[in-house]
C-alpha cells in the first residue's frame, strides 16, 4: 500500500497512517465557527467522504466549491485558523487527487526527501 486515504477503514488499516495529504492555505477567517481555504473539490476530489483535517479532531472539512474548502469548527476546536495559516487535509480517495497534480512531495517528519513527478497527470479518461 503506497497510500492510505481517508476512505479506507481506520480500524482495519490501523497499522498504517494516512500518507496522502493536500496542503492548503486559509484565505478567510472572518466568520465565527468556520474558515475558508484554497483547496476545494478540484484540489481534493469530489468523491466523498470529504477530507479529514490532519491533527484536528473537532473540525470538519467541506468543499465550498470547486476552488474553495470550508473548515467548520466544532464545540472545542484546538485552535482557530487565521488567514495565511497552512493545514493539511487527508484526502478521501487517492487516485483522482494524484491525477490533479504535476508533482508530489515525499516528506518524512519535517523534511522533504524527494519530489516525484506525476507523469500521467491528467491522463484519466
Give the residues covered by each predicted segment.
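Active-site anion/phosphate-binding pocket segments in diverse small-molecule metabolic enzymes
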Residues: 1-125
Amino acid at each position: 500500500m503506497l497510500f492510505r486515504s481517508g476512505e479506507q477503514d481506520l480500524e482495519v488499516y490501523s497499522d498504517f497512517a494516512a500518507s496522502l495529504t493536500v496542503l492548503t492555505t486559509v484565505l478567510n477567517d472572518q466568520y465565527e465557527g468556520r474558515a475558508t481555504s484554497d483547496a476545494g473539490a478540484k484540489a481534493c476530489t469530489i468523491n466523498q467522504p470529504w477530507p479529514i483535517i490532519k491533527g484536528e479532531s473537532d473540525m470538519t472539512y467541506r468543499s465550498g466549491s470547486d476552488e474553495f474548502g470550508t473548515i467548520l469548527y466544532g464545540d472545542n476546536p484546538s485552535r482557530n485558523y487565521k488567514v495565511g495559516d497552512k493545514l493539511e487535509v487527508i484526502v478521501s480517495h487517492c487516485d483522482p487527487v494524484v491525477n490533479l497534480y504535476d508533482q508530489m512531495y515525499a516528506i518524512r517528519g519535517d523534511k522533504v526527501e524527494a519530489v516525484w513527478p506525476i507523469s500521467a497527470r491528467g491522463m484519466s479518461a
